[in-house]
Amino acid sequence: MEEKQNAVLGTAPLGRLMMKFALPCTVSLLVGALYNIVDQIFIGWGVGYLGNGATNVVFPLTVLALGLAVMIGDGACSYVSICFGKNQPENANRAVGSAVALSVLVGIAVAVLYAVFQMPLLSLFGATEANLSYAKEYFTYITIGVPIYVFGQAINPIIRSDGSPQFAMLSMLAGAIANCILDPIAIFVLHWGVMGAAAATVAGQVITAAMGVWYLFHTKALRLKADNFKLRGRILGAYLPLGLCSFLAQISLVIAMAATNNMLVQYGAFSKYGADIPLTVLGIVMKVFQIIISITIGMAAGCIPIVGYNYGAQLLRRCRGVLWRLMGAEFLLGVLALLITQLFPRQIIDLFGSESELYNEFAVTTFRVYLCMLPLATVNKAAFIFMQAMGRPVESAGLSFFREVLLAVPLVMLLPKAFGLMGVLYSMPAADILTFFASCFVLLRTDRQLRK
């Protein structure tokens, strides 16, 4: 049964197979992104833009925890798929067991660090005098849920690699629905403000994690034993590098957000908008961008088991077929997202509360400038993940690091010197254009190798 299930990855029509795996993965990640969007919408109407500004300060710290989770989960997912392609099920079982144990330990460690260094971290990510009290309150409750969040996000790609993308999707969907129901109750009925939004988020994460625990006792191809949950250096060394791209993508984003938030506060203070409007607006735009990128990553990450299996089985023609189908779909997604954000920025920003005309003016400008290269951004992100699926962590992580650290951070620091606050907005499209050339080089070289 196990061999038959895995063999489908090497024989089924690629288009149908990609849809089968990518759709549930995309929905799972999209639902995860909606956690933040839902919080922003209800906080915007129930607390105001300072509350949204506070959640934007905390957001990079959530991304950091996510980065550690996906390094473990995506790395294990890639390794498990390759093991199945090579008919090495015991190595797959050991990788999953150690990934589960590691995610629990990492989640606890991160929560302790967040609790101990709360104030320095909030200051680092751009908290202002006006939003600091909201940020502290929100961050305190988010920190309590970090171990649960890390486990839930790490186990999700592992469930997909076991051939259950639909269950992975449902576990995320259940948590998100709970969050959507509890958010308005906590904010508008119980009047808990940002604390209520955080509590609703953690409650949703508990449901997702609980479903992940249930699945560990009802796996398909995997056969987990107590001995598999030990941390073995050889197994960790085999799969963690494969998740390095996912981690660097997130940690690089955290570094870029820290630089961006501080530049917004610094240059916004000398503009007509002040410090808090730019900080809040860009945070909301980034949440919308996260929805787009969640679809991008979902489409690409859903193909990881397909690429990993076929690469392990040396079915290179099928890997090449996935490559160009994926890149074409990602480019079309970017074009569609670009049209929506360019044509309807005011309608999008109105979802997050009613604010001043000055606020709306900066929001519209930010949408149209900051997101003007979305077709390139989606292709870049998919390129990072495809290289990870091929078992090439150096190229994958290198592209991600090049985009977020070597380009985005210097650009966001330098462009404001010439263009003021607008320079912060120019930094993202500039980084996407330059990264696109590097992505094309890597993808074309990979295509030549897959032709052989």
Give residue ranges: language-model regions.
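Residue-level signal for short hydrophobic patches within transmembrane helices
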Residues: G15-L34, V38, L61-L68, I144, ...
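Hydrophobic transmembrane alpha-helices of multi-pass small-molecule transporters
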Residues: L64, N179-D183, A209-V213, I291, ...
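Transmembrane helical elements of multi-pass membrane transporters/channels
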Residues: K20-D39, Y141, G175, G204-T208, ...
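Helix-terminus/linker motif at the lipid-water interface of multi-pass membrane proteins
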Residues: L34-N52, L122-E129, I185-W192, V254-I284, ...
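Small-residue hotspots at the loop-to-helix junctions and early N-terminal turns
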Residues: V47-P60, A135, F139, A198, ...
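Short runs within selected transmembrane alpha-helices of multi-pass transporters and secretion channels
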Residues: G73, I142-R160, A168-N179, A197-A210, ...
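Small-residue-rich hydrophobic transmembrane alpha-helices
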Residues: N52-V112, Y149-A168, L279-P345, T378-L399
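Short alpha-helical transmembrane segments in multi-pass integral membrane proteins
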Residues: M1-A22, V80-P147, V189-L244, V307-M373, ...
